[in-house]
Structure formats: C-alpha cells, structure tokens
Design a protein with these regions (language model features):
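Conserved NTP-donor binding/palm subdomain of two-metal-ion nucleotidyltransferases/polymerases, i.e.
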Residues: 2-138, 144-383
Length: 383
C-alpha cells in the first residue's frame, strides 16, 4: 500500500498531539496498519526531524504502545526504534544540557562584566514546553538591553586575551554573530531588521520600549538569565514566525513555541494591546490562522479573550493551505551556491510566496521588494 504525503502528514500530526500530552481529535483513532513498512516509518521519522519534532513524535509513539493503541507487532522494527531513541538522546536531550551550560557560561561572562543578558526565542521558548529537553536546541539569541556595542568590545578583548580564534561577525542585519562553545550566538542590537520593510523601524521602537523590562529572569547554573516579558515575547514570536513564513517557510516546532507560550503566559499578555498592534502592522491574519491551527489541529485550549471567530469556507481553506505548507512547503527547491543563480532563486521564491506575503503584511509587495533589494545592498553577504 502506497500512502500519500497527506496521509503520512496526518499520522504525524496525530503523533504530535499525543506526544505533547493531548488526545486525538474527538471521534478519530490512530490507524497504522500491519502494512506500514520500514520505509514508511523512515519517511515519518524524516518528516519529524525536518519539523524539529523527533522527540515529540517518539513520545507520541510511546503513548500509543503504553495504552495498547498501537500493538507491538505494528510498531516499527526494534532496531529502527532504538536508533530513533539514540538520536533523540544525542541530538535533543544531551544537546539541550550542553545548551543550558553554554547559556549559563555566556551569562556568567556578561554578568561579571556588568551586562545583563536576555535570551530570546530558543531557551525562553523551551522553558514553556512540558519537556524542555525535547525542543531542539539551536542558536542562542540574546538582547543586552542596548549594550551590544560595549559588550561585543569586551567579548572581543576577552577572546584575544584567551588566545581564541573566535571572532565577532558584523556582516548581518540587526545582530552580530559569534560562537560560544559549539553554539552560534546572535547578539541583537535590533529585534528586527529595520531595513527590510518600511514599517519595521516603527515596530522596532515598540520592541525597544518593551525590551527595557528587566523584571523577568531565571537562574541557570547559578547565573542570572533574563527573559522577555509576556508582551515582548508574544509580539516577537509572531513577528519572527511571520518573517520566516512569508519569506520561505516555518516548521511545526515554531507553531508549538507559540502554543506553549500562550498556554503558560496567556494570562500575562495584554491581549487587546497585542491584537491592536498586530492589526496595525498587518500581522493579524497570520495570527488568526496560527491560533486556529493550535486549537483545531493540535488540541490546545483557546484563550477566552481570543475565541475563534465564525470562519468562512475561505478561511478554512487558507488554514489548511498554511498547515500543509508548514509540513511540506509549496516552494521547496534547494538554494543554489553561486551568486547569480541564487539571486534568481530568491526572486522566484518571492513570487511563489506572494500568497503568504499578502496574508502576513499590509505593505505593497513591490515596496517590500525594493526595500529588500536595498537591504541586501547594505549587507551583500545576505544575498
């Protein structure tokens, strides 16, 4: 039996629901027939890995086996499952511990030099997950409360004093880049790229004001690490997801970041303010679709003040299109290495994603296009 991508995606979504502690859609049941081949299990595992959810899907499989809803004879082959478990231990759980250690060490450096370090996205999101170690640990995004220049100078001097070959890369928009241990660190001097769209400078002023709040923090291995306020993190997560979705793609892991954030911090968010701000900058359409996916596809409870509105058939079709694009982007070609083919590739991708840009932004696409061209001219390495 040959299964379609949509069927495998639906099985994947069911396993994600179970893996995060939710039940299946009411009235449905998990179906894996005895004809589910090792190759199909491999394809399912590859989808989970692309989405950053290998650990969550494995958790879902464990729920099914434990509850007797997936007979062991229909489970994947023992050796295949052992390899999957090994991957989760190595790439998720062990790496998460290294991630925490790196964050603590970096915060310790800044604390000892008189700087305050706030983590954005990554670790701040992981703290909201039921199993933080089952969220993939990638880059470390930090905000130093406007002290990026002085902090980079101090860090650069420290690198030299240590005889380290590490350098601070200034070729990117809105943040510098360096490596701490084996983790790439993005040290933000702006929360978003103010050159990419005309409205971004105005939105950045809102982020900067919210970024002054230093009342939220945790201790990581004895070092103080600051966290964004609920309003800052909520706005930042939506804006970051929008930027990646409209330009190229996002993963279901990013959807879960938003869902777990709302689940844990929803009572702290000033929802009327956030919705007004999203509407002002044209982000509310994507926000509505994202919330619908979280509630209807992943089983999260809706926020009372954000009850899902009665939706048209057009909205439901749009939600399905967004969901399928998250799972398998409509434009999924590989980026060429050479400059001219890469520039042509970016233009074709921009045109293919026109429907996403209309969903996510108010501004004219061509206004954004020329802003983007100027953005790349300012930092040619971003092409």
């Amino acid at each position: 039996m040959v299964r379609t991508k949509t069927t495998l995606q639906d099985i994947f979504l069911q396993l994600v629901r179970l893996g995060i502690g939710h039940e299946l859609v009411p009235g449905s049941k998990f179906q894996v027939s005895s004809s589910f081949s090792p190759e199909e299990w491999t394809e399912l595992q590859a989808l989970a890995e692309r989405q950053g959810l290998s650990a969550v899907v494995l958790d879902g499989l464990d729920v099914l086996v434990r509850d007797g809803r997936l007979p062991r004879e229909r489970d994947m082959e023992p050796m295949q499952k052992k390899m999957w478990i090994g991957q989760v231990l190595q790439n998720y759980e062990y790496r998460h511990e290294l991630y925490r250690q790196a964050i603590a060490e970096l915060a310790g450096f800044y604390n000892s030099h008189g700087f305050k370090m706030m983590v954005l996205k990554g670790y701040a999101c992981a703290l909201d997950w039921p199993k933080p170690e089952h969220r993939p640990s990638g880059d470390i995004d930090i905000w130093l409360f406007g002290e990026q220049i002085a902090a980079d100078k101090a860090l650069g001097s420290w690198f030299k004093a240590q005889g380290s070959k590490s350098e601070i890369d200034n070729s990117h928009h809105h943040h510098t880049v360096f490596y701490w241990r084996d983790f790439m660190v993005e040290n933000h001097y702006d929360f978003i790229n103010v050159h990419a769209r005309r409205s971004n400078a105005r939105l950045e002023r809102i982020f900067k004001k919210l970024g002054d709040d230093d009342s939220h923090f945790v201790e990581v291995y004895g070092e103080r690490v600051y966290l964004p306020s609920a309003n800052l993190h909520g706005l930042f997560l939506i804006r970051h997801a929008v930027a990646h979705f409209a330009a190229a793609e996002i993963t279901l892991r990013q959807v879960l970041d938003w869902a777990f954030f709302v689940e844990k911090h929803g009572s702290e968010v000033d929802w009327p303010w956030l919705v007004r701000t999203l509407e002002e900058f044209g982000l509310k359409g994507f926000f509505n679709v994202l919330n619908a996916i979280c509630v209807e596809e992943l089983g999260f409870q809706p926020v009372e003040s954000l009850k899902l509105e009665v939706r048209s058939s057009e909205f439901l079709k749009l939600k399905e299109r967004v969901l399928r694009d998250i799972l398998e982007p409509e434009f999924s070609e590989e980026t060429p290495q050479r400059l001219l083919p890469r520039a042509w590739f970016r233009y074709r991708r921009w045109q293919a994603n026109a429907w996403k840009q209309r969903l996510c932004y108010k501004e004219s696409r061509w206004s954004a296009f020329w802003s983007g061209v100027w953005n790349h001219l300012l930092k040619p390495s971003s092409i």
